[in-house]
């Protein structure tokens, strides 16, 4: 892990999310280090279920809006997730985005909301167990993915974070087999 850097800052309330994220990105070399002009960047939120922001179950919309504003300086931000249920459909995603505040975050930041429920098989040549996997198509087609996890406890884990949130790139119920 040599050369990897982590930035940690106290953020006592979500009203400071954008300022703190800007501070972090600047400390890591600026957004131009991560986004090239014209790129389409997926903001992979943790949208476990249709729960309001105050429930602290999903990525907070202030964090998604802040990330989208930073991406928008050079590219296009697209908010997405693939909930764990069998109904990964546009109508379900629409309700999920409304209830979690992601629709408002997109409106406030200029981000797009992704309703594409199609899948793609991607090659994993360095994989030790899997050499390919099915993922949601927007992930395979994006120029980059910014992971916006929600730090919380989990029934199968002590806590969840960035790696666990990436289970959301697997379509619908296929996540179950990977747990």
Question: What annotation goes with each model-predicted range?
Answer:
Residues 1-179:
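N-terminal and secondary-structure boundary signal
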């Amino acid at each position: 892990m040599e050369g990897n850097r982590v930035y940690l800052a106290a953020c006592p309330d979500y009203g400071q999310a954008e300022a703190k994220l800007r501070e972090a990105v600047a400390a890591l070399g600026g957004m131009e280090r991560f986004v090239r002009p014209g790129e389409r960047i997926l903001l992979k939120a943790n949208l476990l279920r249709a729960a309001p922001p105050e429930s602290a179950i999903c990525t907070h919309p202030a964090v998604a809006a802040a990330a989208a504003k930073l991406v928008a300086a050079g590219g296009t931000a697209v908010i997405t997730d693939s909930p764990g249920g069998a109904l990964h459909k546009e109508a379900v995603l629409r309700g999920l985005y409304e209830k979690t505040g992601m629709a408002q975050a997109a409106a406030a930041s200029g981000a797009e909301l992704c309703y594409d429920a199609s899948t793609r098989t991607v090659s994993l040549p360095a994989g030790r167990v899997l050499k390919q996997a099915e993922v949601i198509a927007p992930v395979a087609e994006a120029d980059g993915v910014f992971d916006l996890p929600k730090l919380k406890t989990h029934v199968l884990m002590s806590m969840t974070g960035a790696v666990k949130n990436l289970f959301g790139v697997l379509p619908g119920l296929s996540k179950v087999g990977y747990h």
